[in-house]
Amino acid sequence: MTFSTEIKEAAQPIIEEIYNDGFIQDLLKGDLDAQAVRQYLRADASYLKEFTNLYALLIPKAPSMKDVKFLVEQIEFMLDGEVEAHEILADYINEPYEEIVKEKVWPPSGDHYIKHMYYHAYAHENAAYTIAAMAPCPYVYEVVAKMALDDQNLNRDSVTSKWFDFYSTEMRPLIEVFDNLLDELTANCTEQEKKDIKESFLQSTIHERNFFNMAYINEQWNFGGDKNA
């Protein structure tokens, strides 16, 4: 079993929890609350900006020029391509996407997730740590989307079904590159290093769950009441 396969199998129970949580289940049925959509889109817009910065940090550590080229292409996709999925959700609540994301948010769960990835980018020379922290993002979306497309409860009459259609295919090239890089970059790692890299992957999978839930509950910072706002 390859290392990338091992860590993805270990993450499956967490992904099952993500799928069964309120955000995905309501999205599946086409009745996700509009404020949850707004919170998700605003937080994800901030998240994706930082994700592109993390790609830039990976470029000097990339093993080959082919990998560098792919990372540059992914920066372009993050800036333009993934907006398509966001616009599907904006259409669902009948609000312009650009208007929704004018309001910037930085909720606790998004903050913790981003800092987790930046930590590994700066703390470890081996890019495997950072890739392991980033890889659950595309992987979770693909698995959840494919699960939804096989679910008889998927509301095909709702525009939200197109969100699942998008993520069922569009993440595949990135997942394959991340898998190959993880297998290559961990080939000579010690067992302890592999354990730490695996933990980075699993922690990010939990961060993915928290991120969806953050939108679902409209998570905010609580500094002790309105007087400290």
Swiss-Prot record:
Binding site for substrate: 44, 141, 167
Superkingdom of the source species: Bacteria
Record keyword Membrane present: no
SUPFAM superfamilies: Heme oxygenase-like
Annotated positions for site Increases nucleophilicity of active site Cys: 47
EC number from the UniProt entry: 3.5.99.2
Catalytic reaction annotation: 4-amino-5-aminomethyl-2-methylpyrimidine + H2O = 4-amino-5-hydroxymethyl-2-methylpyrimidine + NH4(+); thiamine + H2O = 5-(2-hydroxyethyl)-4-methylthiazole + 4-amino-5-hydroxymethyl-2-methylpyrimidine + H(+)
This protein's GO CC annotations: cytosol
Alphabetical UniProt keywords: Hydrolase, Thiamine biosynthesis
GO molecular function per UniProt: thiaminase activity
Protein family membership: Belongs to the TenA family.
Name this polypeptide is given: Aminopyrimidine aminohydrolase
Gene: tenA
